[in-house]
Amino acid sequence: MGRRPARCYRQIKNKPYPKSRYCRGVPDPKIRIYDVGMKKKGVDEFPFCVHLVSWEKENVSSEALEAARIACNKYMTKYAGKDAFHLRVRVHPFHVLRINKMLSCAGADRLQTGMRGAFGKPQGTCARVSIGQVLLSVRCKDGNSHHAQEALRRAKFKFPARQKIIVSRKWGFTKFNRTDYIKWKSQNRILPDGVNAKLLGCHGPLANRQPGKAFINACT
């Protein structure tokens, strides 16, 4: 017996049902890798960032997430190079899907009880996605921006419903705008922290501050 189609579970109807000590026997999700590519590249290496954003409230199966990750990774590896990007899957399949199996062979009516006790057993997992939530993100150099957008366009076909490809105004995976990042970088206020960055604030004694600037000389 094959897997029930994911369109049967597309709508979000029930409360979240995660794996727990009460919900046992859950099969492992198909997606096991959430960061692909040069995930250890510093924050200054990949300034460009593009997101694949969900435009509907729905369930996305772990099989669909894995298929989208493979499609995006394959295109970027072929056209941009395996060392030229960092792909991150931004949603995790924690919600457990159930199935109430029905027998369809001859004499099945003697064995099953129909809708009596129809809670069901775990069949798979999915991610509960809301409107405007980011599904996939890719950071790369500005020269590979068109490759990243095309890779996410191909990954879009693996998901149900509607998605949009949105080019981020931020620097890479950080929370800072590109113009602000460049300005603060020239002022030595940005401290690289892996794929993210820290902004040095205005803490410390008043004697270390310049008048009219929320910035410490001692931190530079």
From Swiss-Prot:
<dbReference type="GO" id="GO:0003735">
    <property type="term" value="F:structural constituent of ribosome"/>
</dbReference>
<comment type="similarity">
    <text>Belongs to the universal ribosomal protein uL16 family.</text>
</comment>
<dbReference type="InterPro" id="IPR016180">
    <property type="entry name" value="Ribosomal_uL16_dom"/>
</dbReference>
<dbReference type="Pfam" id="PF00252">
    <property type="entry name" value="Ribosomal_L16"/>
</dbReference>
<dbReference type="GO" id="GO:0006412">
    <property type="term" value="P:translation"/>
</dbReference>
<dbReference type="GO" id="GO:1990904">
    <property type="term" value="C:ribonucleoprotein complex"/>
</dbReference>
<dbReference type="InterPro" id="IPR047873">
    <property type="entry name" value="Ribosomal_uL16"/>
</dbReference>
<keyword id="KW-0687">Ribonucleoprotein</keyword>
<protein>
    <recommendedName>
        <fullName>Large ribosomal subunit protein uL16</fullName>
    </recommendedName>
</protein>
<comment type="subunit">
    <text>Component of the small ribosomal subunit. Mature ribosomes consist of a small (40S) and a large (60S) subunit. The 40S subunit contains about 33 different proteins and 1 molecule of RNA (18S). The 60S subunit contains about 49 different proteins and 3 molecules of RNA (25S, 5.8S and 5S).</text>
</comment>
<dbReference type="InterPro" id="IPR018255">
    <property type="entry name" value="Ribosomal_uL16_CS_euk_arc"/>
</dbReference>
<dbReference type="InterPro" id="IPR036920">
    <property type="entry name" value="Ribosomal_uL16_sf"/>
</dbReference>
<dbReference type="InterPro" id="IPR001197">
    <property type="entry name" value="Ribosomal_uL16_euk_arch"/>
</dbReference>
<keyword id="KW-0689">Ribosomal protein</keyword>
<dbReference type="GO" id="GO:0005840">
    <property type="term" value="C:ribosome"/>
</dbReference>
